[in-house]
Amino acid sequence: QTTNGLDIGTGTGLLSLMLAQKDPDAVIDAVELGTDAAQQARENFAASPWKERLNIFNADILSFKTEKSYDFIISNPPFFEDDLRSPDETKNNAKHDTSLSLNELVRVAQQILAADGSFAVLLPYQRVNYFTEEAGRQGLHLAQQVLVKQTEKHNYFRGILFFNRKKTQPVTASINIKDKEGNYTPEFVAALKD
């Protein structure tokens, strides 16, 4: 059975390619505002063995029209909402929350997510609580979160959040990318395989 996926702000398409490889039933629509990034994603998709299941749309997700409801939605939105901005607007759109606010991202996901679908987002750790609260206000509830550290000694710097429409007790996991010796941890390697 085909599952419909949506990658909001796909960039060069890496996450879409990974999902297509992992799920042989997934048909993925990837939406990217930036023309250059969308073109690179188009080329990456065309060169992949999953090209028949990957669609790229050079569009703003706020004006993206679809009749589909999506079984899964993923997004890795811009990270540097409050940091110094570049004079280069392309870099700003790639690195800053300039073209799609986190509130708008939740609203879009809520509107087109299937009733039993899931929405996954990768965020800077300092945005995790805000995003979780905003998603809850809009009817998407945290099911699972994976909090990421560089090493055990570091603070969390990323959160991988999974939402759905059902209220449940969220599951929280923590992962360190590297161990004390600077090697990738087995947990991180296993997570990359998943």
Model regions: which residues?
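Conserved SAM/SAH cofactor-binding pocket of Class I
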Residues: Q1-K68, F72-S75, E81-S86
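SAM/dcSAM-binding transferase cores
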Residues: K153-D194
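Hydrophobic alpha-helix-in-membranes signature
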Residues: N76-P77, L123
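Mobile active-site "lid"/loop adjacent to the S-adenosyl-L-methionine
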Residues: P77-E104
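Short, structurally constrained coil/turn elements
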Residues: W50, G136-G139, V171
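Conserved Class I SAM-dependent methyltransferase catalytic core
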Residues: S99-Y156
